UniProtKB/Swiss-Prot annotation:
Sites where the protein binds pheophytin a: 129, 142
CDD domains linked to this entry: Photosystem-II_D2
Cofactor detail note: The D1/D2 heterodimer binds P680, chlorophylls that are the primary electron donor of PSII, and subsequent electron acceptors. It shares a non-heme iron and each subunit binds pheophytin, quinone, additional chlorophylls, carotenoids and lipids. There is also a Cl(-1) ion associated with D1 and D2, which is required for oxygen evolution. The PSII complex binds additional chlorophylls, carotenoids and specific lipids.
Gene name for this UniProt entry: psbD
Name used for this protein in its record: Photosystem II D2 protein
Oligomer and partners: PSII is composed of 1 copy each of membrane proteins PsbA, PsbB, PsbC, PsbD, PsbE, PsbF, PsbH, PsbI, PsbJ, PsbK, PsbL, PsbM, PsbT, PsbX, PsbY, PsbZ, Psb30/Ycf12, at least 3 peripheral proteins of the oxygen-evolving complex and a large number of cofactors. It forms dimeric complexes.
A GO biological process held by the record: photosynthetic electron transport in photosystem II
Top-level taxon: Eukaryota
Extra remark beyond the main annotation: 2 of the reaction center chlorophylls (ChlD1 and ChlD2) are entirely coordinated by water.
Residues that span the membrane, as ranges: 40-60, 124-140, 152-165, 207-227, 278-294
An annotated Gene Ontology molecular function: electron transporter, transferring electrons within the cyclic electron transport pathway of photosynthesis activity
């Protein structure tokens, strides 16, 4: 006689069922992060496509900004709310739009909709990288690297306008609109002479250089022991051996520069560190601009240029350009302020 003794199956809660379904191995992983990422990305992209296709910026900026009005991909945009709206979230059911969708679009409600859903969508994408890295048991450096673009997006589209008078001063979501915002940053904040911008440029361009050098070096030192017709068929994806020779690469760059990375860990960490640090420095600089912190000022050159008509430097010439940007842009962008600049404040020659 055989007696089978077993434990009764524990009752599974709703959380366990949801966890199993969300983290199931499927073609497109959903995960808990997907609950944030997927709806937010859908709404942000949908709001942007809706705005650039149908919605005018006549009521907020006095501009045409949609395909319906004759714009193209480079000139269409979802524009920021008008200056009078301040930092209102412009909820569809709020006191401004009062659940009127047309009025909500006219007031710039799509911009806050896209900005907020876009921010949470980017955060959801970073959490997705954390979640999948944990599931497949690898380090989470991809997610850490993606914090750089998130920091830049949040600082430019949310923190900067929060430090200014309203969402009006944030960039609109469009190609030409972003270019105009860059000119605005230069004219009103002298952004190119800001040390944080300099660090950001060094990080991004330095990363591009590192990426090009690294890719070329790996291609140059591939082992030719495969039978395939090209690089992509020559190796088994699960091979145990190295694909390229680090020793040969080290010898090459030692001869070129006199120094070279001695191991792959330091090399690849450096390639991670340079662009991410550049992005974070840029984000910190924009946070400073939100508080109206100034860039470098070389006052001695300004005073001498004002006193001596024959003295000029590239710095003083750029200052005149910035003054011109401010004089033209302020009156154009803020007609409601009725800004009238007297002749003596407009740029003339090299007199500051």
């Amino acid at each position: 006689m055989t007696i089978a003794i077993g434990k009764s199956e524990q009752k599974r809660g709703l959380f366990d069922v949801a966890d199993d379904w969300l983290r199931r191995d499927r073609f497109v992983f959903v995960g808990w992060s997907g609950l944030l990422l997927l709806p937010c990305a859908y709404f942000a992209l949908g709001g942007w496509l809706t705005g650039t296709t149908f919605v005018t910026s006549w009521y907020t900026h006095g501009l045409a900004s949609s395909y319906l009005e004759g714009c193209n991909f480079l000139t269409a945009a979802v524009s920021t709310p008008p200056n009078c709206m301040g930092h209102s979230l412009l909820l569809l059911w709020g006191p401004e739009a009062q659940s009127d969708f047309t009025r909500w679009c006219q007031l710039g409600g799509l911009w806050t909709f896209v900005a907020l859903h876009g921010s949470f969508g980017l955060i959801g994408f970073m959490l997705r990288q954390f979640e999948i890295a944990r599931a497949v048991k690898i380090r989470p450096y991809n997610a850490i690297a993606f914090s750089g673009p998130i920091a830049v997006f949040v600082s430019v589209f949310l923190i900067y306008p929060l430090g200014q008078a309203g969402w009006f001063f944030a960039p609109s979501f469009g190609v030409a609109a972003i270019f105009r915002f860059i000119l605005f940053f230069q004219g009103f904040h002298n952004w190119t002479l800001n040390p944080f911008h300099m660090m950001g440029v060094a990080g991004i361009l330095g990363a591009a250089l590192l990426c090009a050098i690294h890719g070329a070096t790996v291609e140059n030192t591939l082992f030719e022991d495969g039978d395939g017709a090209n690089t992509f068929r020559a190796f088994n994806p699960t091979q145990a051996e190295e694909t390229y020779s680090m020793v040969t690469a080290n010898r090459f760059w030692s001869q070129i520069f006199g120094v070279a990375f001695s191991n792959k860990r330091w090399l690849h960490f450096f390639m991670l560190f340079v662009p991410v640090t550049g992005l974070w420095m840029s984000a910190l600089g924009v946070v400073g601009l939100a508080l109206n912190l100034r860039a470098y000022d070389f006052v001695s050159q300004e005073i001498r240029a004002a006193e001596d008509p024959e003295f000029e430097t590239f710095y003083t010439k750029n200052n005149l350009l910035n003054e011109g940007i401010r004089a033209w842009m302020a009156a154009q962008d803020q007609p409601h302020e009725r800004l009238v600049f007297p002749e003596e404040v407009l740029p003339r020659g090299n007199a500051l």
